[in-house]
Amino acid sequence: MGDVTRGEWVVWGLEAGPGETASLHHPGLEDMLLFFPETLAILSDTGEPQGELTIEVQRGKYKDDIGILTHCLLVHASSRGFLDKSLCGSSLLGYLNNNLELMEQHSQEFIKFPVLPMERKMSVLKQDGQFVVTRSVKEGEETKTGVSVFPYKTFKGFVSSAANVVLLRVMAWQQSVPSGARFLALDSEGKLCHCTYKSLGFQTIQVGNQQAKMFIVEQTIHSEEGIPFSCQYYLLPDGHLAKRVQVGSPGCCIITKMPLIREEDVIESPPTFDKKPLVWGEDLELYSKFLDRKEQLRLSHASYLRHHPEAQALVSDFLLFLLLRRPEDVVTFAAEHFRPFAALRSPIPALRSSHQPSPFRTLENEEEEEAKEEEEKEEEEEEEEEIAGEIEGEEEEEEIEEGDDYLYMDEDEDIEDYTYYENYYYNYDEEVDSYDDVNNYDDDDIANVDDNDDIDNYDDDNDDDDDDDDNDDEDDVDDNDDDDVDKVRAKVDNLSVDNDDNDVVNSDNVDVDNDNNNQG
């Protein structure tokens, strides 16, 4: 409730400085074991019992004026006794939040004198952001009532009678009282004033055969109109009230039986256990999991090979390349070999651990290395393409044989040319047989025959050409396919001319035969 913290108040939430009004705040009330009942005996100045005092602090719930239930601290105290053989008593009921701020409080005091009984009541309620104090005094048949309203801000640091009970128990646990601290309080007339707390040291009390050390705290309510009201509290270390003395009164309240002193629970640190080496092979559970996982992976591998028969071929190809190239770094070679088969190809190497980047290497060096790797890969692909092209060229080359002549040609040439060449050679052989006899021709006819019609000359030329072709190197044929095609076409043109000449010779032969028949 305050902003200033001084000295030991910080320990348990009381805040004040010398001459200042303190405020209350304590977040760990439940940790101090403050919830317990206690009973004290009221004794006269002669030591005779006159009654008893009961105090209890417990957890409770409070319903505000709009019907909302909240958790709170419930303080209840009551006393019954005799004063000059007249019955007297008091009661207190208060609701506090965890910051010891008052939510509602009701108090009552009475003395039943034979002639003029007296009764005094006072209630403090929090309504609409302000505190309403209602006080009534009844003497005989006459009753006086007064109502006072205080803004909520003016009650900052207010210590009610209920809060005083809890605050004393907190002081007992801490064995300390703030020096020079002031709090707000209400006097017996219901007017706002201030109160102070002061430590009176320690004292030993003996109850029966037991002794205990008590911490003494004095509270003084400084009324502006009346004399100060002081009360001394003798507190046991666990917060129990062992004795209460009102200054100026002959009587007192004291315990008759020593309570069981409770000590604050000491939280022990959790035990530390040395880490033992884990031998999974000797652990039945872990070894069982290992066998199950091993069998699962084996079945998964077998299932994958059944559904992907091409995997065996890929492995075989890899082993073949491995034996042929014999790389120094087998792991990197395997990564580069199987990289094209990856489902998601990334620009980084498949095995990043083989190329761990140095923390001191710049990104430019890394990019240069990646570019260099890509260039080497492209060169390897080009070499493989060239080798594959040479193999395909050898397979596509065809050899055509006609007698002693060999004609090399590619598949790109027109198939109609092949048919034409074969038909031509076939017809030519038949015609040569019919013209071998030179006597069948007249001299004029022979003279009219062109030099190109001489079959012997043609055959010699062809033989020479074929011999030249046979002597050419196979590499020249492969490299000069266009030249060979031109030569073949030239031969075809010559043969076409010779064919036309042969047609003329055939017609002449027909005429000669007819003349011979007529002469016969």
UniProtKB/Swiss-Prot annotation:
Keywords: Cell membrane, Cilium biogenesis/degradation, Cytoplasm, Cytoskeleton, Membrane, Nucleus. The keyword Nucleus applies. GO terms for cellular component: actin cytoskeleton; cytoplasm; nucleus; plasma membrane. Residues 352-409, 423-520 are annotated as: Disordered. It comes from the Eukaryota. Pfam families: CATIP_N (PF21772). It is found in: Nucleus; Cytoplasm; Cell membrane; Cytoplasm, Cytoskeleton. Its main location: nucleus. Residues 504-520 have a biased composition (Low complexity). GO terms for biological process: actin filament polymerization; cilium organization. Residues 365-409, 428-485 have a biased composition (Acidic residues). Signal peptide: none annotated. Belongs to the CATIP family. Interacts with TTC17. Plays a role in primary ciliogenesis by modulating actin polymerization. This is Ciliogenesis-associated TTC17-interacting protein. It comes from Mus musculus.
